[in-house]
Structure formats: structure tokens, C-alpha cells
């Protein structure tokens, strides 16, 4: 069974945890409790293939930004989540995207733009970035599966493209140890 390491990023309060818990437990969490970092696993079938999603739900608050590089290194794909009722969270997406590309040292990384709490000019940004856009509501569960499953499909496409291009990386395989900050 293929395992996918998914990372959910975005500003504080956009609904990253609510989306993740809705996917994992079919339950909407109404109250806001800032996340430092939570990890979830779920076995799902996507396009006929059984796979294991290893999902890292990250902190959106600025005081935890030092942790970002580490989880960006280990993630295979990223849900870039903003709240459609917060222009600032939408503007922050570009910063997350650039940081992911810098840390991964790659121009193309599997990402899905997720507009949670539904309806802003986000579709055009996703088109400009060349990545899928999914509107979600963690409360009603609208688009929750689609967001995570689309990201897995993006990872598969990315692996396929890299396999076809036969690109070899000269970077050594590195293992990272946990650091206390």
C-alpha cells in the first residue's frame, strides 16, 4: 500500500484542523483551538488504489514559523488552505508556496489551493499557479475528500513526470533528527 505524506498549511484560524478532522473522523470541530502540530493517518481508496494518508496538520501562528522548514522538507504534497472570508489568509498563500518551493529546492511541488469557508477570487490564483483549486467547508464536509484526494493525484502525477524524465538528483539522502527550538 502506498503511503502519502500530506502537509496542511495556512494562516491561523483558516480551518486546517477542521478540514483534517472532518476527513479523518467525519466530524466538524466548531471551536477554535490553535494547533501546534498534529499528525493523522487514514487508509482510503483513491481511483481504485488503497493508500495510507499520513497527514500533518500544522500551526498557522507566526510564533511557530521556525518549525515550517522541517515539515516542508518531509512532506510530499501540500494543501495550501485559506479562509474565503479572510483576505489576509489568502494573501499569505503566496508566502507558503514560495517557502515550500525554496525548502524543497524545486519549481514544481504537488500542491492544492483550498478555499475553506467558500467563495473569493481564488480560482484565478490557482490557475496562475498552475495548481488545482478546491473550495471546502469543514462544517458541511463539502469538498473535504476532494481536497485531500486531489493532492494525492498531484503527487502521483509529479512522481510519474519525474519517472518519465529520468531525472537523477545529485543530492544525498539526508535524515533529520528532532531538534528542540
UniProtKB/Swiss-Prot annotation:
Residues 179-181 form a propeptide. GO terms for molecular function: G protein activity; GTP binding. One of its GO terms (biological process) is signal transduction. SUPFAM superfamilies: P-loop containing nucleoside triphosphate hydrolases (SSF52540). InterPro entries: P-loop_NTPase, Small_GTP-bd, Small_GTPase, Small_GTPase_Ras-type. Its main location: membrane. It is an enzyme of class 3 (hydrolase). GO terms for cellular component: membrane; plasma membrane. The keyword GTP-binding applies. Signal peptide: none annotated. It is a lipid-anchor. Keywords: Cell membrane, GTP-binding, Hydrolase, Lipoprotein, Membrane, Methylation, Nucleotide-binding, Prenylation. A lipid is attached at residue 178 (S-geranylgeranyl cysteine). It is found in: Cell membrane. It catalyses: GTP + H2O = GDP + phosphate + H(+). Alternates between an inactive form bound to GDP and an active form bound to GTP. Activated by a guanine nucleotide-exchange factor (GEF) and inactivated by a GTPase-activating protein (GAP). GTP binds at residues 10-17, 57-61, 116-119. Its EC number is 3.6.5.2. A motif (Effector region) lies at residues 32-40. The modification Cysteine methyl ester is found at residue 178. Belongs to the small GTPase superfamily. Ras family. Ras proteins bind GDP/GTP and possess intrinsic GTPase activity. Plays a role in eye development by regulating cell growth, survival of postmitotic ommatidial cells and differentiation of photoreceptor cells. During larval development, mediates Ptth/tor signaling leading to the production of ecdysone, a hormone required for the initiation of metamorphosis. This is Ras-like protein 1. It comes from Drosophila mojavensis.
